């Protein structure tokens, strides 16, 4: 067995991926393995985000820390898949190098050339924004609007949201699975109709979200 920081990946999986026989869409065992890799990657990224939150709680600028650290979150998120040979390490360097589309959405994210211009400006605005609630709502929204990566944008966007939550004294906030449709609907309104209010209300209504749960 091979090991990636405590995560065990079988030689059989490595060979299956190498030979092109790994098919999680058709094979339940392969699908379970993919879920395991995703879970391990999420855990690794979560540890990295917690380290970023410590910097924020120590007085660091949340926008600057997000700019400095989000690439590391992304690498951790897909690290187990790199170890398994499912993803190439080079694919995790920088932002996406192609067009990406969002299933069941009318919103088409900006092209890859625009991403290179948008992301530095995005983080600059996060660094300058004085209101934590604005950083939470618009930070999450604009990140997923741009969709800078080929995959994992929602997870990284929620990590970013929680870093901004910490900067305002709010607790860690999750999006329950049963609220997923509400989340997507609110983001669609913001992305297509330019109406951010449903998304702001959605976040405020989440477990841990909203001023009513702010730590003092």
What residues fall within each predicted segment?
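FIC/Doc superfamily catalytic core
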Residues: 1-216
